[in-house]
């Protein structure tokens, strides 16, 4: 991927972050710094020439973790996240990754429903993990998609 293309993609991801997570958005520079690590990669979905969705993930040996995933608000509920998961699952399984982890706010019911639809299961709950000023703390759910079990069941 050429540098100009990558920079514009990262800028678009940072812009989407600001739209969908204004209090917790990761900046362009944070994304650039993370992507300098060999274990971290970025998938993007385009519509025409526009970045409409992204997934930032990290691989560590036989396990991967989604660090950030998002879809531009104008393109939500159009299957963008499912396309991201399909591509990510294909890449990770080709690399013999056994499981994929993610963390989600327990009050983010649309995201949880999507993750469950993709085959993720809740494996842990962090009580009061997300703290927001003037609001009660929200739990974090750790969810896992186990490729090894999927392969065993389908094989």
Task: Describe the residue ranges of each PLM region.
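Acetyl-CoA-dependent GNAT
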Residues: 3-74, 82-87, 91, 95, ...
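Conserved glycine-rich acetyl-CoA-binding loop
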Residues: 50, 69-86, 95, 99-100, ...
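Conserved catalytic-core motifs of GNAT/GCN5-like acyltransferases
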Residues: 103, 116, 121-139
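Short hydrophobic/aromatic beta-strand or adjacent loop that forms the aromatic wall/cage
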Residues: 40, 137-142
């Amino acid at each position: 991927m050429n540098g100009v293309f990558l920079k514009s993609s990262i800028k678009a991801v940072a812009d989407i972050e600001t739209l969908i997570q204004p209090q917790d958005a990761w900046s362009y520079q944070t994304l650039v710094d993370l992507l300098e690590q060999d274990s971290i990669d970025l998938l993007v979905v385009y519509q025409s020439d526009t970045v409409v969705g992204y997934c930032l993930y990290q691989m560590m040996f036989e396990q991967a973790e989604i660090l950030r995933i998002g879809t531009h608000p104008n393109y939500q509920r159009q299957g963008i996240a499912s396309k991201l998961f399909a591509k990510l699952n294909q890449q990770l399984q080709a690399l013999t990754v056994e499981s994929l982890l993610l963390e989600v706010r327990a009050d983010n019911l649309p995201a949880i429903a999507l993750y469950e639809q993709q085959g993720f299961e809740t494996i842990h709950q962090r009580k009061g993990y997300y703290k927001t000023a003037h609001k009660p703390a929200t739990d974090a759910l750790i969810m896992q998609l186990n490729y090894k079990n999927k392969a065993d069941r389908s094989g």
